[in-house]
Amino acid sequence: LRLLNLINQILEFRKTETQNKKLCVSKGNIAPLIHEIGLKYKELNQKTKIDFQIQIEKEEMLLFFDKEIITIVLDNLISNAIKYTEQGRVTLSLYQTMRNEVAYTEIKVSDTGYGISAEALPHIFDRYYQESGKHQASGTGIGLALVKNLVTLHEGEIRAESMQNEGSTFYISLLTDNIYPNAL
């Protein structure tokens, strides 16, 4: 199963690199999808010292989105959060915010894990980059690069904040009113 996931991740990454991955959006309520993804990880989480939380601001949040892309992005971010957290909390949040009079729908994945060093933080979305150190886990270094490519394809933004030994937070910002005229 792990090998299959790795192969799928590499194939998805290549599609984003060669512009063969197409954005396929439909208008809908994103809240149930986020809740469903969160419940999957809440049930799959085998680390008893991690409290997995789902925080959804409103039951109805309408926007155009690509369900497959959102799922792949969150699968990567949440599995990383669980992998790099021994104990504490992993939280998946969905909310709406305004910046410069523009409405955004934001998805946030935060953890109380090992965190990312200040030196590594600017490079985490680079292809094949892996932070070295005592908490390095097995991987290919394409997970976050794939996430970045998919969020960019979705015309969104992703950013990360982290403090070593305190945890990390990843923010995905999507324009709430984007109608994606060039999407399928």
What do the predicted segments below correspond to?
Residues 24-29, 46, 51-61, 97:
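Conserved catalytic submotifs in the C-terminal HATPase_c
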Residues 143, 147:
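Short alpha-helical Gxxx[C/S/T] motif in the catalytic ATP-binding
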Residues 14-25:
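Helix-loop junction within the histidine kinase core
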Residues 116-128:
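Short conserved segment of the HATPase_c
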